[in-house]
Amino acid sequence: MSPNSSKTRTDQISSMPGINEATKVESKNVVKDAVPIKSEVETNGTSIVREKQDPSYVGWKQVGGWEEKDELTSEDLLVDVNKDTFLGNLLPDKFYGDWYHEVAILIIAGLCSFVLGYFKFSLASVLIVMLTTGMLYRTSSKKYRESLRDLAQKEQTVEKITSDYESVEWLNTFLDKYWPIIEPSVSQQIVDGTNTALSENVAIPKFIKAIWLDQFTLGVKPPRIDAIKTFQNTKSDVVVMDVCLSFTPHDMSDLDAKQCRNYVNSNVVLKAKIFGMDIPVSVADIFFQVFVRFRFQLMTTLPLVETINIQLLEVPEVDFISRLLGNSVFNWEILAIPGLMRLIQKMAFKYLSPVLLPPFSLQLNIPQLLSKTGLPIGVLEIKVKNAHGLRKLVGMIKKTVDPYLTFELSGKIVGKTKVFKNSANPVWNESIYILLQSFTDPLTIAVYDKRETLSDKKMGTVIFNLNKLHANHYHKNEKVHFLRNSKPVGELTFDLRFFPTIEPKKLLNGDEEPLPDMNTGITKITIRELKGLDELSDKKFVFAELYVNAELVMTTKKEKRTAHLKWNSDYYSVVTDRRKTICRFVLKDQSGKVISSSVQPLNHLIDRTEVNKEWIPLRNGKGELKVTTYWRPVDIDLGLKSVGYTTPIGMLRVFINKAENLRNPDSLGKISPYAKVSVNGVARGRTNERIETLNPIWNQSIYVSVTSPLQKVSIDCFGIDTNGDDHNLGSLNIQTQNIYHKDNDDKYTIFIDNAPRTGNLIGKKGVKGTVTYYLSFYPVVPVLSLEEAKEVDEINEKKDKLEKQKSTLDDKNISKEEKERIKKEEFRLTEKYDMYSYKMKLDLDELLQYNAGVLGVTVLGGELPQPGLYVQTFFDSCGYAAITSAKNAIRTIKTGWSGDFMIKELEWSVTTFRVTKTKDANKAENFICEVNIPTIELVRNCYYKPSVLNLIGKKSAKLLVQVSWFPVTATELPQSDLITNSGDLKITAKSAENLIGVNKNGYSDPYVEFFLNEKSTSPFFKTAVQKKTLNPTWNESKTIEVSNRVNDYLTINVKDYESTNSNRSIGKAVVPLSTIDPESDTTFNIPLVGPKGEDGGVLHLEFEFEPRYTTNVVKREAGLGNFATKGLGTGIKAGSTVFALGTNVVSTGLGTIDKVKAGVFGGKKSTTTGDKKSEEKQ
C-alpha cells in the first residue's frame, strides 16, 4: 500500500518487538474534502489570505502504509534477511561477496556486450548476458551487505583501545523500544506547529497561496548517541561533556514487503500552491552526524542548571535525498546540481562559525527560558572613565579630535557616550547601561571621531570577552588598548559590572518565591494589536509610536488600515526609576497625522498584564490598543536613587473574617492557619495564627496600599504543621472592579461594603476551603511628596529658562536641529508637569493636621552588629512586621528598601525598628536590638531630611531613615482599627441580687467565673465563695489584656459551691466587650439566665478600660508547631446574636440589656467557637 493510496488509515497497534500490543498510536485520517483554515497575513501593508492545509500522512504508520495485517509475527521476525540465492548455492565463496567482485562483474558484462555487438549477435544474446550478470551481481551484493553487518556486530563487541568515549547503549535501547510509540505524536506536533507558522509567515512571497507539510515522518529508527565523554578536571559546579549524535536511515534493501511496512525511513513532503497547482518537494533518507560539546553551569536552587553552552566541534555531516515534484515520474533530484552540496557545506560553515563553532558557543539561560518572558539575563553597567593617547587618522582634514565611544553586541550598537570636544585624552566618567542576552557574545567598543558634515570616522576598536563576568560580576579599572591595523592607538580605562535579572525561585515544596518589589529592572513592552478603528480615511496605512519619558524609542511597521491590526513589536529597556517612567502610545496614519494616543505609567502597564487587562482604550474612544508588558527586577546599584517609594492612590482595607473547611496537610494533627494579603504577588500583611483548627476565625483587618486600580490583590492561606513548617493551603483573587470610583473632579471616593464576600481557595490540589472577608477603600489625599515638590520646582525653573532662551533666538537664524531640540524639551517638560498637576503642595504642618494617613518608610543605609540579619518595622499593635528587609549579607546596609503602613491615629501611633536573626520573627520573639519611637515624632524628624536612628539591645545598630506622610480621606474609621480596640480591661464583680437558691435551706454558696471567648476550659478570673446567700457582695477585681475589644466577648458563669459534689451552675450571661465604653467606667446590671431558662437574678459588674497597643502574638516554641499559649483568639463579631440556652446577653447598645430565648449553651454546650457564625463589628 503506497503513501499515495486513497485508502483510509486507521489507528493500529505497533508491530515492533517488545512493544505492548495494548498500546495504540493515533493515526490521522486522510481528509480530502476538508475546508482549509484561512490565515490572514500582512505583508508590507497588504493583506494575504493564506490557506492552512491539513497534512495527508503523518507518522511512520501512515507514510509506510501499515495495516493490521502487516503486524509481524514471530515467524516473520525469524525470516533471515540474507535469503539463499541460486548462484550462492553453486559458486564457492571466494568468487563473490567483495567489492572487487562487483567491479569485475560490471567489467565482464560490459566486455561481453561489446563482443556480442561487435560480431553482430542479436539483442537476445545481450539480454542473456544481462540476466546472468544481474543474478551474479545480486548474489555478490547480498553477500557483501552480510559481511558489513557482521563487521558492525564485531565492532560493537570488541573492546575499544581508548576509553575516553563511553557508549550509552541503555539509552539507545530505550529509544529503540519506545520511539515507534512516540514518533507519530512527535511528528504530529511538528506538523501542526510548522503548518501554523508557514501560514502566518510574512516572508513567504505573495504568489504562494498556501504552503504546508503534506507528509511527515522521522521513521522508526530513532536518533542515536554514538559516544559520550565527560571531562574530569572541571570546577565542582561545572559539567562539560562531548556527545556524538547521529541519525541514520534504516537499510531496507534485504527486507520483504511486509517487513518494509514495519521499518519506515524518514520522509518529508512539502507542498506549495502556486498559480493553482500543488507543487511537492520531498526530502527522504535524512542522515546527519554531529559532535557537540555541552557545558552545564550548575546552581544550588531549582532548576539546578543555570546555563547550558552548546558548541559544535565541527560542521555537521548532513546528507539527504531531495526531489522536486516529489516521487512522480517527472521528479528531479535537487542535489544532482554540480557543486550544490559543497556550496551548502561552505555556507553552513560561514554562518555557523561565528555562532556555534569553536571558540563560539550558544548559551541558554535556563531560568530565563522557564520564565517564558524572553527577557535578557541581566544589565551590564559600563562606567567609562577616560582614554588617553588617542591617535587620529593620518590625512584627516580635521586637525582636532572629538571622540566618542560606541558599544556593540551581536553586530548592533547598544550604547553611546557623549562627544568629548577637542581632546585626545577625553575624560567621560559616564555610565552606560545595556541589556545582556548571554556572556558568550563579546563586547565591541569602538572610538569614533565626530565630524559635522562628513560621516564619523572610526579610530580604533576593542573586543572584550564578557565570559569573565560570569564568575566575577565586577571588574574595576580595566585597561585595554584600542587597535587599528593591529597596532595600539590609545588606551581606555573603564569599569564593568553585571547585575543579573532576578527570576522567581522555585522552592523545594514546589511554591515560587515572590519577586522583590524593586524600583530598577528590565521591561519588555510589546505592542500587539489594535481594534475598533472604524474611522474612515483615505490614508490606507497605520503605525504606532512608543515614547518613554517623552523620548521616541520604537516605531511599528505600517499596516493596512482595517478594523483589526496586528504588530507584535517588542521594545526592551533598562529601567532605572520605574515609578517615574511614563509611556505614551501614539497612533498615526501614513502622512504622520495623529489619530489617537494614550499615556500610561509603566506601573499601570505592568499591572494590566498582571490582571490580564491588556487592552488600553485610546483617547476620544478611537479604538483599543493591546499592550503586553513584562517586568523583572534587577538590583542595579544607583545609590539612593535605586530606593524609591511609589505614592499610593489609596488604602484597601481587607477585613478577613474567617475560613472554613481548610485542607489539612499535617498527618500528625491539625494545622495552625493564618492568612496573608498580597498585592501583585508581594505579601503586604498577615493575620495571626489560630491554633489547630480547620475553621479559623480571625476578625482582623489588613490595610494594603494600591498604586493603581489595576493591581492584583489576593488572599493566601497558609498553615503551620506540628513540625513548624509552612504549607500553602490555597489562594483567591479579590475582585476589585467595583471598588475604585471617581467623582466629578476625577478624585477617588471612599468605598465601604458592609456585605460579606466569600471566595474559594484554589491550591495545587484543587479547590478546598472558603474565606469570608469584607472590603473598604480609603483614597489618599492627592498631595505632592517632598521629592515630587522639588521636581515640580525644577520643571518650573527649566520652563522659565526655556522661555527666556526662545525669546532671545531669532526664528530666521535658528537651525532646524535647534528648533527640534526646543520642541522636544517643551514636550518633555509638559508631560512631566501633567503628572503632578492634580496634586496639592502642602508643608509638614499642614500634613500633620490629618490624623490618619499612609506612612512611607525608606531605609537608605545603616550599620548592623553582624552580617546575616534582618531589619523589621512594626507599627502599633501589629504582631508581625509590616516591612521586612532582605537578608543583609554584610554589616553595612548599601542597598536600601521602602514600605508603607496605614496609620489610623497619628497621635497614638508607635513605630518600632528591630534587628533580628529570623525573617518571620513576630513581636514576641527574641531580637538583637530595637528602638520604639512615636510615629508623629518620626515624621517630624525624618520628613525633610534623613535622620539616624540608634537601635539598642544586646548589641547596637544604626539606621538612616526618611519618611513621607500622605493623608487619607477618612472621616471615620472602624472601631476595631483604633487604639480603643486593645488595652487593659479591669473587671470588678460587685454584687448580685435574687440568685437561684439550690441548697436545702433555700440559699446558695455563689461565686462567679469569667471566660474570654470560651477559648479555655479554666476561667481567667474566679471570685471568692459567699456562703448561704442569694444577694452576695464580692467587690473583687481582675485586670486582663484585651487585643480585640470590638470582637471579643466575656462568658460569665455563676455557680453554687458544693464541698462534696460538683459545683452547679445557677446563672449564665454573655457580655460583648464592644458594649464597654473605652473612655469611661461602665457599670452593667446583667440579667442571668438559670439552668432551665428561668430568671436567674441580676449580676452587678463594673468595667474600666485603659486603651493601649498590646502585643497580640505569642512566642513560638522551638521545635514545635504549637504555641505556648492557646488563650489568644477572637470570637464572634460584635453586633451578631449570641445564642445561649438560659443565658442573657448584653446587646450592642451601650447600657442596654436583652434576653434571648434559646441557644446552644445547655448541657450540650460546645467549648469552642469555631463553628459560630462570625461577623464584623464596625
Curated annotation (Swiss-Prot):
The keyword Cell cycle does not apply. One of its GO terms (cellular component) is plasma membrane. It is a multi-pass membrane protein. GO terms for molecular function: lipid binding. Residues 164-367 form the SMP-LTD domain. Residues 1-17 have a biased composition (Polar residues). GO terms for biological process: endoplasmic reticulum membrane organization; endoplasmic reticulum-plasma membrane tethering; ER to Golgi ceramide transport; phospholipid homeostasis; regulation of phosphatidylinositol dephosphorylation. It is found in: Cell membrane; Endoplasmic reticulum membrane. Keywords: Cell membrane, Coiled coil, Endoplasmic reticulum, Lipid transport, Lipid-binding, Membrane, Phosphoprotein, Repeat, Transmembrane, Transmembrane helix, Transport. Residues 1-98, 142-1178 are cytoplasmic. This is Tricalbin-2. It comes from Saccharomyces cerevisiae (strain ATCC 204508 / S288c). The lineage of its organism: Eukaryota, Fungi, Dikarya, Ascomycota, Saccharomycotina.
